[in-house]
Amino acid sequence: MSSHDHLKNLIQRIELSLTNHYTISIATAAKEESWSASVFYVSDQKLNIYFISFDESKHIQGILKNKRVSATINQDVSDWMQIKGLQLQGVAYKVPEQHRKNILNAYRQKFDSIHELLDLPKTDDEKKIAKQFNSISLFCFEPHWIRLLDNSLGFGSKEEIEIKNQTWLIKE
C-alpha cells in the first residue's frame, strides 16, 4: 500500500470512529487546575469536532484560559484486546454565530432522539433542554494530532496523523 493510500485509509478509519461514537471526553488545563468533561459531539470532513456547552462550565472556563486541549473517544470494554479509540490533541474555541445553524442541524442528523426532545418536549427536564439548546454556546475542537488505537490488530497497535502546513500526514 502506498503512503498516500495508507493515509487515506487511516483517515477513513478515523472518520468512521468519529461517526460511530457519540461522546468525547475533553481535557483542559489552565493555571494549576485541570478538568475533563464528556460531551456529545458531531464532526466534519476535516476531522474537526463540534460540541455544545455552557460558557460557565468548568471545561469551557479552562478552554477560555488555555485553548490547548486533549481528548479521547472510546467504547467502554472489559477485554484488553477490544480496546479501540482515538486520542487527540489540538485547540478548542467558541464557534462564530454564523455557523450555528449548520452545526445544530448536524446534531439533529446524528442524534435521532433529539427531534422529539426539541420539537415536542414532554417533561420539565426535556423542556429545559429544548429551551437551552437554541441558546447554548457551540465550540470547535480542532485536532492537530490524532492517534487511532486498535488492539484487535495486535496489543498496543496505534497509528498517528498530524497536521503539517494544513494537511494531514502520517506521523512517523
Give the location of each predicted region:
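Generic structural signal for secondary-structure transition and capping sites
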Residues: 22-23, 68, 112, 146
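Short, surface-exposed beta-strand-loop junctions and turns on beta-sheet-rich folds
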Residues: 57-59, 78, 154-156
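Short, solvent-exposed aromatic-acidic interface loops
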Residues: 54-58, 108-111
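Short beta-strand segments
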Residues: 21-55, 61-63, 69-75, 83-88
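Alpha-helix boundary recognition
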Residues: 18-19, 64-65, 108
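Extreme N-terminal tail/first-helix region
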Residues: 1-23
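Charged, gly/pro-rich active-site loop segments
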Residues: 2-5, 84-172
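Catalytic micro-motifs at enzyme active sites that drive phosphoryl/nucleotidyl and oxygen chemistry
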Residues: 74-77, 126-128
